[in-house]
Amino acid sequence: MGACLGACSLLSCASCLCGSAPCILCGCCPSTRNSTVSRLLFTSFLFLGVLVSIIMLSPGVESQLYKLPWVCEDRTQQPLVLQGPLDCGSLLGFRAVYRMCFATAAFFFFFMLLMICVRSSRDPRAAIQNGFWFFKFLILVGITVGAFYIPDGSFPKIWFYFGVVGSFLFILIQLILFVDFAHSWNQRWLCKAEECDSPAWYAGLFFFTFLFYLLSIAAVALMFVYYTESGACHEGKVFISLNLTFCVCVSIIAVLPKVQDAQPNSGLLQASVITLYTMFVTWSALSNVPDQKCNPHLPTKNGTGQVDLEDYSTVWWDAPSIVGLVIFILCTFFISLRSSDHRQVNSLMQTEECPAEMVQQQQVAVSDGRAYDNEQDGVTYSYSFFHFCLVLASLHVMMTLTNWYSPGETRKMISTWTSVWVKICASWAGLFLYLWTLVAPLLLPNRDFS
């Protein structure tokens, strides 16, 4: 009897994995929308790739792999071949990260193309989006195995520039998400203050606004101390000063009376969040400056105080990379878990709130202990755009894990000004986007920006 019950349980799990219903996760989250479950599972595939990349970057894994005589010879010699033209060096360091992230990006790019113009769950392709997870996992594994057989050649350099462009775009998406988060936060606390008639909510908004600006000022001071030097590091001084000036300007514009009249929910909380994020991007950019005098993250390799960049054989993680990875994880979850209550953000991110008619269906789903399909009359998010965001996320995490270092001609990682300029330009573009959200209702009064 026990064997029969076990077999039935296995068959049930198999039907969940191979069918069109996300049963396993729904069992853990019985009142979850079908669309949310699917996004979480796709995001888990991305995080699985990130975990594999982190493991392959670990120095301990590298040293243990080279100790196996049937895998690799001594690192000073030519590596052995594993069952075909696979260089075992591709299993290590930044080369493994490039290939793993190439696989995840290709996986999501395939689904981005496949899901173009899906309008509702009645489309047959919606069943593929929301189910068949076992086969999706097999596809991802197959692409990953194939990626590790890609010969080095010019692949790392070409893929580096793909990563630069994708990461630039994902930085802008992160800023949009921060704007939306701060907007929702500000709006809800103001509503609480009006409902409860309590000044504590206003005090909370003031405290966090003050805290974010205080952290931003501290970041500016620390960047001037550690990333600039008297008579040198002119680029760093200009970048810090310009971004500080731009942040002050957008903060002032956010509280102008005309802007407040057009957008009553705009305020210093959103501006403080954008200021703090801009300072982080600036810090991250300065950590890639290829000059040891202006970048304390670069170790000195010789007695002259100069850094021999070609001596870099491994990639280390600095503080900006760790913070960037945490922000990446939070923003990716943010994309997966919710739709915005801000119409402009919904339009830009191709999402929408759950329709009112879904409330009754949700209540029935909770009582029945199951997930419910909230996309019969129309999808709540663009499938293609969601996968496009995950493609950009794959490229961004690739650059984050490799510290934005460019692969050199001798299979080393080198720091370049390209990474610095891309991040600085991304910070400027992000500030411009935020500024546009403030002044657009004034410049285009005939359009609805509510």
From Swiss-Prot:
Bilayer-crossing regions: 5-27, 40-57, 96-118, 131-150, 160-182, 203-225, 238-257, 264-286, 315-337, 380-402, 417-439
Organism whose genome encodes this protein: Mus musculus
UniProt KW NAD keyword: no
Catalysis: reaction(s): a 1,2-diacyl-sn-glycero-3-phospho-L-serine(in) = a 1,2-diacyl-sn-glycero-3-phospho-L-serine(out); a 1,2-diacyl-sn-glycero-3-phosphocholine(in) = a 1,2-diacyl-sn-glycero-3-phosphocholine(out); a 1,2-diacyl-sn-glycero-3-phosphoethanolamine(in) = a 1,2-diacyl-sn-glycero-3-phosphoethanolamine(out)
GO biological process, one term: plasma membrane phospholipid scrambling
Protein name as it appears in the record: Serine incorporator 2
Function in brief: Non-ATP-dependent, non-specific lipid transporter for phosphatidylserine, phosphatidylcholine, and phosphatidylethanolamine. Functions as a scramblase that flips lipids in both directions across the membrane. In contrast to SERINC3 and SERINC5, has no effect on gammaretrovirus particles infectivity.
InterPro entries according to UniProt: TDE1/TMS
Recorded GO CC terms: plasma membrane
Coiled coil: none
Family the UniProt entry places it in: Belongs to the TDE1 family.
Subcellular location(s) of the protein: Cell membrane
Membrane protein topology class: Multi-pass membrane protein
Keywords: Cell membrane, Membrane, Transmembrane, Transmembrane helix
A GO molecular-function annotation: phospholipid scramblase activity
